[in-house]
Amino acid sequence: MSTLDELIQKARHLRSEGHSPGQIADELSLSMETVTWLLTQEKGAATPKDVHIDWTAVSGESQLLVESAQMLLSRLHLKNPEGPVPQVYVGIAISGIPLATLMAVTEGVRIGIYHPAKHAGGDEPIGSMSGNFDIHAGERIVVVDDVITSGKTLQEVINYIKRHGAVPVACCVLFDKRGIRDIDGVPVYSLFKVSRID
């Protein structure tokens, strides 16, 4: 998928399948603003400035996904060799979950799952941890996702972790569209930084 028309078609298809705009944004690795535009744009309207990342060649292949999780772990350990040892890897739904699971298995620690507000319904959506894959006060947490588009979701997760008495020690992502080094003092480690040159 590379053309704008294909992105519009894919966004509309996902919407017709019942996906929320937040879920579509995650599926296409685009900002919420871009997805809103894809779903509602008018002829002649200016196209938002965003970068589409299609990593389905990796995400759909289990061995490549394992290797990606290993690279994230290597990046974390190389950048923070003396850092606190994580007790839980929290995957952000949806694409952060398999990466966090594989990282947690390798490290022999627990997995947590966070459902961001953009996936929730209602008038005032809020994010939350899965009841079956929760965190506990005092635990050291690494947050894992596939793409940083705006940084809002990572900020939301870090705020949640701190409010519940746990300690976020790092964030690991495959792709960073914003060049974010840290969020509220929590270091962000990415494998790839993606920039748009206008």
UniProtKB/Swiss-Prot annotation:
GO biological process, one term: regulation of gene expression
Disulfide partners: none
InterPro entries linked to this entry: GfcR-like, PRibTrfase_dom, PRTase-like
Pfam family membership, one: Pribosyltran
Coiled-coil portions: none
Molecular function via GO: DNA binding; orotate phosphoribosyltransferase activity
UniProt KW Ribonucleoprotein keyword: no
Domain of life: Archaea
Family: Belongs to the purine/pyrimidine phosphoribosyltransferase family. GfcR subfamily.
Protein name (Swiss-Prot/TrEMBL): Transcriptional regulator GfcR
Organismal lineage: Archaea, Methanobacteriati, Methanobacteriota, Stenosarchaea group, Methanomicrobia
Gene giving rise to this polypeptide: gfcR
